[in-house]
Amino acid sequence: MMGKPNSTPAKTQKSISSFFAPKSSQKPQDSSSPPASKAPGNLDDADSNEGTNEDAKITGNRLKRVLEEDENGGNTGAKERPSKRAKSVEVEEEDNESYALPAADSRKTSSSLTRGKSKPSLRTNKYMFSGSSQRATESLIEEEPEDELEKARKVELHKKFVKKLGHPDSLRRIIHEDDAALEVGDEEGEEDEEAPAPVKTKKKGAKTGKLTPMELQVIDIKRKHMDTLLIVEVGYKFKFFGEDARTAAKVLSIVCIPGKFRFDEHPSESHLNYFASASIPVHRLPVHAKRLVAAGYKIGIVRQTETAALKKAGDNRNAPFVRKLTNVYTKGTYIDDIDGLDTTDAPSGGAPATGYLLCITETKAKGWGTDEKVEVGILAVQPATGDVIYDNFEDGFMRGELETRLLHIAPCELLIVGELTKATDKLVQHLSGSSTNVFGDRIRVERVGKSKTMAAESYSRVAQFYADKLKAHQSSNNAREQELLEKVLKLTEPVTICLSAMITHMTEYGLEHVFDLTKYFQSFSARSHMLLNGNTLTSLEIYTNQTDYTQKGSLFWTLDKTQTKFGQRLLRKWVGRPLLDKQRLEERVAAVEELKDNANTPKVDKLNATLREVRSDLERSLLRIYYGKCTRPELLTVLQTMQRIANEFAHVKTPSDAGFESIALNEAVASLPAIGEIVISFLDKINAQAARNDDKYAFFLEHYETEAIGDHKCGIGAVEQDLEAHRMVAATKLSKKTPVTYVTIAGIEYLIEVPNTDLKNVPASWAKISGTKKMSRFHTPEVIKFLRERDQHKESLSSACDAAFSTFLSEISTHYALIRDTISHLATLDCLLSLATVASLPGYCKPTFTSSTEISVIGGRHPMVEQLLPSAYIPNDTSLSTSPDHTRALLLTGPNMGGKSSYVRQVALISILAQIGSYVPAESARLGLLDGIYTRMGAYDSLFTAQSTFMVELSETASILKSAGPRSLVILDELGRGTSTHDGVAIAEAVLDWVVRETKCLCLFITHYQTLASVARGFEKGKELRNVHMKFTAERNGRRVSNADADKDNEDFDEEITFLYEVGEGVAHRSYGLNVARLARVPKSVLDTAASKSRELETQVKQKKLLGLSNMISNVLENGTDQLDQLIIGMEQL
């Protein structure tokens, strides 16, 4: 109820001439008397009285007043009626749920509600429907305090009533036995549900068990959407019913009123008369909806689709309000908030999801066991940005290819078409079922069936979808759109099935329009980027660290110095997809170099300042405009930001005007002013202040308003003129010579005040609305009619304003491609500036690229570890090349904790950084372009595929041997440790030999098997494979022991080991495992036993080697020099 408090003096009604003139803002306030809550047992009290004929109420009031005047002379009746009137109104007011909301605007689900809305201006208030004309006849009668005689009389009547009843509170006790009073609380301070009123009233369905009209509505909608948690609009609250109420109470920490939880009328709940329920206030809907979606639920908003004034003017005035499911949201489709879901607040604290929905389908498996092959099709869409990724590939029994794509895309929701094979299903469950997985949060999984004719149906549905789009968008770009359509129709069968399923799926959420943007379809398998498989992403910590799966400590965290959300998303793509195109790569590096070298110049400062001023996510907002979900303040922010950017670079007409030497920078800057004229043309049509305040009635400037808006505003003005003219008519009936003055009390307008001494002149047809001890206030029948007509115009005006705004958004959407390209260039500039910031760090250098496959780094460092270490990182050199007479593989040995894994990760990360276009942490770097990096690091089993640690190890190794090529980098860490020493050494030696001889790729092989050093002797000295180790120093009894002498005595327990973290030539003959045990604080008695056993085992090994050498010597003496080489190798190993 809109208006001023009762204590405020009555305000004279404004004249019509002041209606269209600008006025100072006036803050509307709620009535001081909130409506009483209804009994929780009856969910449809509001609907049961919705259709009551208002004329009957007016007639009843008129007859009561006439009787009072006849019996009491016009004064006493006015004194006695208020208490009864107040009680009846208190019960009825909430029953009319349509009057609980002050305006139709309060039903909006825009994200602006979460930030608070500005108070509308007085002029806008004139257009807003407040329902005051309907409430006028039902308002409380305001009275002066009762005198002492009246109070005493009422006390006496109450005593007689109690005596007749038998004892105090007996009526309340009776009611409590039928319907227990339940209190509702909300930890957030929201409006509470009150206990049932202590008055026994007849409630529909309370005893008969019959469902009320609103309950039938809820059940009907719920049965059609059983997988959806429904939030139902009921008057001034949103409510949850049944099992949905219990779920919402748990997630939102609100109270659930007990009742029926099932929607199938199960006999076990036949004794219950009403549904369980929980409620939230209207203004908190966006907050709670976001929390439910973030918790993984699919929610639906059920709204009243008709308004009070138009309902009373329609044919269904006696029926309940019509309710429909208007919005459905899940994690991937929640775009009604510009900030989306803040996944950093997830319970797991994991990395933020990318917002992709990913659809998977696959064919039946071919082959058995390790020979199993399946064909998989995927399609992922990011509704917030419009990006679509698709792929079709064959996968082995380990499902490594699918895992790679899932880790790259990091979806927040999966749609599975048809049945999956057991291995695929287990992989999906493993990645989606844990809140501590690499995605940082649980993934919502939805499944749909797959018929035998799915392929044909999908092709037909996709073709029809795009044919309809082409028909609806006949334009000058039709040839281009036709070309894009042909691209979509050429997709493979599995991808087409996914696309069809995704179109159907997104239609439920009203987001199917994202597939119109076929320009942004990308193939995952396009070999224009380096391939980083799932193991590589995890082992090298590209997106998240391996400790707690957060971004801190990852490569992306190291590079992310972006200033915008859309720039951050683009950088994430760059990090996961390093370039293979040498020309594009050199252009990107040149742009970074120029930005770094000109860091404090005006042109670079202008770019930084422009990006700092972008405070909204333009890419998300543009998609929300395209979907028609953008709010007015958000639209104003987008248009003004784009205008500001265009004005900053208005002088740039061609790329050469940008003033940079880099082609990439000039092209990006030159695209920014291209949208200036388009944006200004839209800004010229809107009222900026009204848009900022989310004022729909004044959003458009007057000469740009639609005809419907103008007609309804004129209609409201005409009604105001009629009301003004009615002042003299009312005065004539009161026998006055001057026009009456309208007053507004408690939000009820156009009241005529009459002193109680003059009530004899008031016509019987006038309806008394409120009064005091000295004054009575009335509405004439004509005023009631005019107000009802005005309210109908106001609600129609509201609908017309929404329709005009929707059309306005559609007009902007026609320029989507141009605006999107501008935002993409702005994101590119943000990423380049981020890389330039990293390049400015101490010790970073510009990499140079060669046509050969090589990695030549001097003074290289680990990019993440050096930022996390409190001390300086020890640099190392690396030289690998596939060219003849060069080393292409390193066999790396060294003590435990000596830095072997950090070194090989450093080499891989430097290569990735270079191909992203970044500077690298080294003194100098000369690199060839790698087409893939493959890693096999760590030890873990795979319960979801029932594989042991060693099986996982060998399966991943087999996948690497099949996938790696001459331009790849392979990293193998301690291969063979999952089995016995002899088997492990044999497998490790065979794999190493294969990689070096057959694959001929760059390789870093870490091992603790010193015997593998002999493999290098199978190649020419100093070529192909070279033995290196991590340097260390050992001190025994204060005397330094060299690596060569380390194994002469086995007293390693008494040695002090110092790690140098430098790479040196040769083999580390010992691993110093007992030193690590001592650092781990293993008990001394255990260490003593281990040291003794270690010496014993090593002595036995030496004895066996000596015996073997003596046999070799005998063979050499008997058979000549044929086995002389083997003898030399054995002596060296000994």
UniProtKB/Swiss-Prot annotation:
PROSITE patterns: DNA_MISMATCH_REPAIR_2 (PS00486). This is DNA mismatch repair protein msh3. The lineage of its organism: Eukaryota, Fungi, Dikarya, Ascomycota, Pezizomycotina. GO terms for cellular component: nucleus. It comes from the Eukaryota. SUPFAM superfamilies: DNA repair protein MutS, domain I, DNA repair protein MutS, domain III, P-loop containing nucleoside triphosphate hydrolases. Keywords: ATP-binding, DNA damage, DNA repair, DNA-binding, Nucleotide-binding, Nucleus. Belongs to the DNA mismatch repair MutS family. MSH3 subfamily. Residues 1-18 have a biased composition (Polar residues). Residues 78-90 have a biased composition (Basic and acidic residues). Pfam families: MutS_I, MutS_III, MutS_IV, MutS_V. ATP binds at G894, P895, N896, M897, G898, G899, K900, S901. Residues 1-145, 183-207 are annotated as: Disordered.
